[in-house]
Swiss-Prot record:
The organism of origin for this protein: Acinetobacter baumannii (strain AYE)
Pathway, per record: Amino-acid biosynthesis; L-proline biosynthesis; L-glutamate 5-semialdehyde from L-glutamate: step 2/2
Organism classification: Bacteria, Pseudomonadati, Pseudomonadota, Gammaproteobacteria, Moraxellales
GO molecular function: glutamate-5-semialdehyde dehydrogenase activity; NADP binding
The protein's role, per its UniProt record: Catalyzes the NADPH-dependent reduction of L-glutamate 5-phosphate into L-glutamate 5-semialdehyde and phosphate. The product spontaneously undergoes cyclization to form 1-pyrroline-5-carboxylate.
Gene: proA
Gene Ontology BP, a term: L-proline biosynthetic process
Name of the protein: Gamma-glutamyl phosphate reductase
């Protein structure tokens, strides 16, 4: 069986590489034509795709998947409509491929510049959410990349049904149908092959739980665009406007719990802790959020707040639990974030411009926010259209990864007969 999985993955890889050579030179109009044809195919096959999703849902229930996983797995008519709108948004995005920047003459008379080009073949590994299949496929096509999609086994029927519509759209436009391929086996060995096929795959993008991303990071022989977790902070500084701080800290924690840009630790300046903490604690109590606090937090709010341990400062709860710490000022807040955080998204609430700029400069995260919720750390909210993932690494892409994150640059040299002396 291992040999057959290996042969299957080698075939998928070769087909993706061949398709990428065609896609890399496809015009914007041709790529948009393919995406529009995919839109039509999805519309025409909505009933079949939703029926396939129901098969996955029934299997999920019989396998006793938890309610959060089932929620991510489900494709409702409203979510399907949202998928289609996301595809429209990608069609409307400016195509970065072929853009030439930094063009300048050298003393020798040659012109030097940079041209934006596709990465080649993207391998994506993700869990549960079938809409990611379409988001990733559309971004790959628009950016001129072939993509190999390995979704979770719990969403296999949904992903296959969406992939059929994508293939149909590619055929209509005359682009290779293997530009987008869904791995049609639930065998975990397929992941091991995908992340080591350096001859076929140029970058791996894992989206899912920490254990999945750690495995991919440790075993991959290919560059990985990833974030391990989202331990995000909001620091309410002494000069914060509390009319802003209350809704920001409530939204950052309770808007959605199971997402990587939700706040997990609240830091409050000691100068305003006595005033601010009782108000926000009351709002959290209404939402049934469990608080785990430092000794000063517990002194102010009482014993209903559980004692925070060292582990709490490192924890991404993905649920209605929040760690709270009172700090002496901005220096302690920044030190805490840089020590315990995951370099994802961290925010300050303050009316002091100098301290806001200091926070922006010193916090080592992929997104740093002033006077707004951490929940804005998202490709759509940043104007990127859909996103293929979020990166907390510093090489290549950082933060939400949209079209430009799926591209690279090559040097171009324009001459008129010059030779090196």
């Amino acid at each position: 069986m291992q040999d057959s999985i290996e042969q299957y993955m080698q075939k998928v890889g070769q087909q993706a590489r061949d398709a990428s050579r065609v896609l890399t030179s496809a015009s914007t109009s041709l790529k948009n034509h393919a995406l529009s044809a995919i839109y039509t195919a999805l519309e025409n096959n909505q009933a079949a795709i939703l029926a396939a999703n129901q098969i996955d849902m029934e299997k999920g229930r019989s396998n006793q998947l938890d309610s959060a996983l089932l929620d991510r797995l489900e494709l409702t008519p409203a979510r399907f409509k949202g998928m289609l709108q996301g595809l429209k948004d990608v069609i409307a995005l400016v195509d970065p491929i072929g853009e030439i920047t930094d063009l300048a003459y050298r003393p020798t008379g040659i012109q030097i510049g940079k041209m934006r080009v596709p990465l080649g073949v993207v391998g994506m590994i993700y869990e549960s959410r079938p809409n990611v299949t379409l988001e990733a496929a559309s971004l790959a096509i628009k950016s001129g990349n072939a993509i190999i999609l390995r979704g979770g086994s719990e969403a296999l029927e949904s992903n296959k049904a969406i992939a059929e519509a994508v293939k149909h759209g590619l055929k209509v436009a005359g682009l290779p149908e293997h530009s987008v391929q869904v791995i049609e086996t639930s065998d975990r060995a397929a992941v091991g092959h995908l992340i080591t096929m350096a001859e076929y795959v140029d970058v791996i993008v894992p989206r899912g739980g920490k254990s999945l991303i750690e495995r991919v990071t440790n075993e991959a022989r290919i560059p990985v665009i990833k974030h391990l977790d989202g331990n995000c902070h909001v620091f309410v500084e002494a000069q914060a406007d509390l009319q802003k701080a209350l809704p920001i800290t409530l939204n950052a924690k309770t808007h959605r719990y199971g997402v990587c840009n939700a706040m997990e630790t609240l830091l409050v300046d000691e100068k305003i802790a006595e005033v601010f903490l009782p108000h926000i604690a009351e709002l959290y109590a209404e939402k049934q959020v469990e608080l785990r606090g430092c000794p000063e937090t517990r002194r102010i709010l009482g014993s209903s707040v559980k004692p925070a341990t060292e582990e709490d400062w490192y924890t991404e709860y993905l649920g209605p639990i929040l760690a709270v710490k009172v700090v002496s000022g901005i220096d302690e807040a920044i030190d805490h974030i840089n020590k315990y955080g995951s370099h994802h998204t961290d925010a300050i609430v303050t009316e002091n411009y100098t301290l806001a700029r200091q926070f922006l400069a010193r916090v080592d995260s992929s997104s740093v926010v002033v006077n707004a919720s951490t929940r804005f750390a998202d490709g759509f909210e940043y104007g990127l259209g859909a996103e293929i993932g979020i990166s907390t690494d510093k090489i290549h892409a950082r933060g939400p990864v949209g079209l430009e994150g799926l591209t690279s640059q090559k040097w171009i040299v324009l001459g008129d007969g010059q030779i090196r002396q």
